[in-house]
Amino acid sequence: MAFGPMMRLTTDRGLSVELAPFARDNLNVFVEGFARGTVTQYLSAHRVQTIETEQAWYDEMIKNKTSLNWGIWAVDGDKRQLIGNTALTEITKDHVHYATSGIVITDKKYWGQGIASACHRARTWYAFENLGLHRIKSAVIHGNAASWRALEKCGYELVYTERNEEFVNGKLRHMDCLECLNPADWAWRQWWGDDRPPRKSLEARKRAQAAVDWARQNVTLE
């Protein structure tokens, strides 16, 4: 389960992207990206990585049976460039099926182009419609407004806030813990049972459904 299947998609700005496996030989992309403090400042482990630490991570990742990873590849004609990765980790299929999502785009020239939002929608669609998950969890450090907006647009909502979770740029930062619930009727009924969903969850459900609908139209599963 180390890598998820290839998905091809086009962003709202017309950029071609592939979510696909990457090789050990591709890890320099992450070493170079994680050398920049602006890339790592809002990551839980904001440390510079070396090729040795990235290789150790890769070797563990490909053996992990509870995670699915995708490289984020920018495609321009016949050229493919690895610019980051996204993942579903801690995939659990007990009485409730859930996972934790994450993403990083290490090449800064691809920031602000809607790539993360498109990847969120593709990953969410795959998690709900192909893995049958009820819930996806994520977290955002305060100050990382772009990540918050991208996740919210995809159907994530705030569950609770961990105070003073990280120290970033000279100050303590809180961390918002988020969730995205599967909007399908069967999953929604199982999750809420006899409880009445609050208004914010109903609004998030509409956004999650819109994300899934977008992916159905714009994502090709290879």
Predicted regions and their residues:
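A short helix-loop-beta-strand connector motif used in the catalytic cores of GNAT acetyltransferases and
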Residues: 59-71
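Acyl-donor (CoA/ACP) binding surface of acyl/acetyltransferases
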Residues: 1-36, 69, 77-222
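Conserved GNAT-fold acetyl-CoA-binding loop/helix
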Residues: 38-59
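Generic N-terminal helix/loop capping motif
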Residues: 33, 37, 61-64
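Juxtamembrane/interface motifs at transmembrane-helix termini
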Residues: 49-53, 61-63, 105, 195
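Generic beta-strand or strand-like secondary-structure segments
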Residues: 53-57, 71, 100
